[in-house]
């Protein structure tokens, strides 16, 4: 199906792609989206399958609550160091390879968790559970960064935010499934094998789907001008020259990473927090389900809205500020007994304001850091979020104290009920801090949209007016970290598609030197169709015209 023309969309296209192929979308992009969405959902169910029934698991397997917490915390621990490697795989090896590898790791981890139930007399079942969770955590590192990459490579500009939303929100959908399904499946210790088996089935299905149905990392023809230049910097170059020096990106990464860490800690500890106030594991699962459900509903409304309006910054700031406001009443109400309606309402608001802005914030990260690869731009935020999540979760559990007064606790028998008041106030304070920093200090141009529309790129970081760093030139169009205008000059247009120089046959016309550059070397014409070939370096290079001749014009935009 042919994509919209430049006249219809108002998007300026790279000269070479426009002259040779144009932009095109493929129906199989929806298969790729389905595979990544199912994989994200399955991985999330495996992550939190134990948390909603922590007391039953601990009692039947003779484990402490600290060990149960580590079955969830291991995701954060493993994802932090291996997340960097996963970003490199995603941007350098390719989206298809990363997805298939993640699917197999996810399936292997789900099977390993079942060993204590399938083999009678297994010694130390916790080791098998932890090993399986660790493999699933490795899979998460590969797939949780994929939605923004998939949206950029396979979807046109007017569908990117929606595609990113669908793939990203499949992860909290998995959390929702775990919160609802685990308490339903596990009523007593004998039900644990059933729960583990049920969660293995979707992992096997998505493994088969990814292996058979995913054929290539990138489409033969890019769907947009931004896709044609996607991942134009190598991972280490983008990290050193752009992300670390881009003040707007650093602020977004720290604040959004903190919110990710808070959400992860909230989901993992919710059952323990509410059981201390006398609420059942079933009600805790309901609150977790409301948290995710309203987040998904909010994202379904916010994704198409941002696709139309491009209000990435406004939506992110408003959503996270409202999320912080909802954290305060939850910190207070959750420690009171009998406040079921108020708890359900606050959990719903937390999901509506917090989870719903996740996909939009990931798109904002790509816009803020362009031309850095989508995997690196979003992946570093998730890695930072996992690291912050470890610290927040450890701090919240460390700040709990034993209740001295009588309580109606429904927590595991044999353990004193805990008081989570200080821990929850810490969570609310951190939410407020991160949202205020983001609202006041974060400002950025939309660099990818500027590149696609052919507008003169912004050469200065909007935060304090400081330069974005050594990776951003202070020159004119086409030299400031985004693609320059791709509209050819009248003289260039008059020469036709061959663009030959009157000074000699086969040479690009000098009037076209400002057009969007093409890739260097023989691989230029097929770079978009080869998995992993979009991972390239920002460097000086020569243009190649359709006839294959060279010009000495240098450009910072080359895909090698």
UniProtKB/Swiss-Prot annotation:
The keyword Membrane applies. Belongs to the major facilitator superfamily. The keyword Membrane applies. It is a multi-pass membrane protein. One of its GO terms (molecular function) is transmembrane transporter activity. Coiled coil: none annotated. It is found in: Membrane. Its main location: membrane. Residues 451-540 are annotated as: Disordered. Residues 466-481 have a biased composition (Gly residues). Keywords: Membrane, Transmembrane, Transmembrane helix, Transport. One of its GO terms (cellular component) is membrane. This is Solute carrier family 49 member A3. It comes from Homo sapiens. The chain crosses the membrane at residues 30-50, 70-90, 100-120, 125-145, 166-186, 192-212, 250-270, 282-302, 318-338, 341-361, 379-399, 422-442.
